[in-house]
Curated annotation (Swiss-Prot):
One of its GO terms (molecular function) is toxin activity. Keywords: Cleavage on pair of basic residues, Disulfide bond, Nematocyst, Neurotoxin, Secreted, Signal, Toxin. This is Small cysteine-rich protein. Contains 4 disulfide bonds. Residues 1-17 form the signal peptide. Its main location: secreted. It comes from the Eukaryota. It is found in: Secreted; Nematocyst. One of its GO terms (cellular component) is nematocyst. Residues 18-19 form a propeptide.
Amino acid sequence: FVCVQARQIDPEQILRTPEKRASCSSRGGICRSTSIGCPRRYHSCHLFHHCRSHGDSCCCPNYG
């Protein structure tokens, strides 16, 4: 996924984003496209999910 700072979010740009996998650029960044290829027991975070830390892949753990 690609994560960007909230103030840089442009909804139209989000929909045009070709990248499917990337890490967050900074703490507090936001996922702006869905991930493919997340590891087992993880799923693609929803759009605008807040990244926990630099390098977060935007794959979220499955619960339950």
